Structure formats: structure tokens, C-alpha cells
Regions:
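Cyclic nucleotide-binding regulatory module and flanking cytosolic helices
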Residues: 1-27, 83
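Glycine- and acidic-residue-biased ligand/ion/polar-headgroup-sensing regions
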Residues: 34, 45, 49-56, 75
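Cyclic-nucleotide recognition modules
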Residues: 68-126
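Short phosphate-coordinating micro-motif centered on Lys-Gly-acidic
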Residues: 37-42
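His/acidic/aromatic-lined binding-pocket segments of jelly-roll/cupin-type domains
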Residues: 28-29, 45-50, 69-70, 173
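Phosphate-/nucleic-acid-contacting segments
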Residues: 145-188
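A generic structural motif
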Residues: 58-60, 97
Length: 188
């Protein structure tokens, strides 16, 4: 399990004074596997860092299928950008795939911290920058790499995802069926 300080330092080290401001307003919560942390029908007013556990972000397509498009592990963060930016329910669901320990912070409190503490504002910028970069990489990979190449890249860069996340969610994340993923895995 990762400490809040360890997670913050992973992204952007901050002073003890700034960390104390953040830590005082953060609550550690435990949630069970299969908990829907963010529901597309509800506004979620919290931001979470994952201290322990895994999660996925998914949407429901027009045929009623769940389509996973982000997979999370420890040190990642959970946030509904619709909720954060527009204070409205998001279009996505975030489900825990393992029992989890999360650090929870109210979004409005986080925004006030950003306004009053430059180090925390810079931390927020780094989080947003890294999210934008990762999103762009996934998009470009989907456009330019074969399914086999996407799987090999995931295996090389994030072997823990392959070990811990169910294959049906990995297949969905890669944009392929579980049968196709099984074929790819048998050839590697």
C-alpha cells in the first residue's frame, strides 16, 4: 500500500507545509471489489488517489456493452472530469476491480487549495498534463498499432495490469474481443 506522501512524490514533490494542507483535508477510505465509485447517473464530488487496488473506467455503448477505456492501479487517481469541470454527472463509470484503499478529497476543497497554494496548483497541473499525455498515447496507439502491438506494449510497460486485471477488461481496453486477445496471447 502506498502512502499519500509517496503518491504525491510520484507525481510532483511538494513541501511539507503544502503536503500538510493536503493531508489534513484527505480521508482514507476502504472500498470493496466491484464498488462503482463513479456512476454515470450521479454527480461525484470527490477526487481519489489509489493507495491499494485497481479500477477501470468504462462507458455503455449503444448496444448495451461495457467498453473499458482506462485501467488504473496504485498511485493513479480517479476523477470525473465532467464533475470536476462542470459539476454534473459524468458519462462514465469507475469500478473497483479489487478491494481498495483510497485517499479521498472533496473536489471543491481541492479547487480552493489550488487557488491558495502554488505548489498544490502545480501538482494539479502535473496531474492534468500526465492525464492528457496518457490519453493522447492511448488514442495514437489505437490508430497506429495493431492489436498485437498494443498488447505487447501493455505487457512491456505495465505487466502488473496483465497479472491483476481480468482479461475481459484488458481486451475491451485494447479494443478487441476476449477471443482475439486469447489468440494473441497464445502466439506470444
Amino acid at each position: 500500500m502506498y502512502s499519500l506522501r509517496g503518491i504525491i512524490n510520484h507525481y510532483h514533490p511538494i513541501s511539507e507545509a503544502s503536503f500538510q494542507k493536503l493531508e489534513e483535508l484527505t480521508v482514507m477510505v476502504e472500498m470493496s471489489k466491484r464498488t462503482i465509485v463513479f456512476d454515470a447517473k450521479q454527480y461525484e464530488s470527490n477526487f481519489y488517489f489509489i493507495a491499494k487496488g485497481s479500477a477501470r473506467v468504462y462507458v455503455i455503448d449503444d448496444e448495451g456493452n461495457e467498453v473499458s477505456y482506462i485501467l488504473f492501479l496504485e498511485k493513479d487517481y480517479l476523477l470525473s472530469f465532467d464533475g470536476y469541470l462542470h459539476q454534473k454527472p459524468s458519462y462514465e463509470y469507475i469500478e473497483l476491480l479489487e478491494d481498495a484503499v483510497l485517499y479521498q478529497l472533496d473536489i471543491e476543497v481541492l479547487k480552493r487549495l489550488y487557488q491558495t497554494d502554488l505548489e498544490l496548483a502545480n501538482l494539479g497541473r502535473v496531474l492534468a498534463d500526465q492525464f492528457a499525455y496518457a490519453t493522447e498515447q492511448r488514442f495514437i496507439d489505437r490508430l497506429t498499432l495493431s492489436a498485437t502491438a498494443r498488447y505487447k506494449k501493455l505487457l512491456k510497460n505495465h505487466p502488473e495490469i496483465i497479472q491483476r486485471i481480468p482479461l475481459k477488461y484488458i481486451a475491451s481496453y485494447l479494443g478487441i474481443t476476449q477471443v482475439s486477445l486469447s489468440r494473441i496471447r497464445s502466439k506470444i
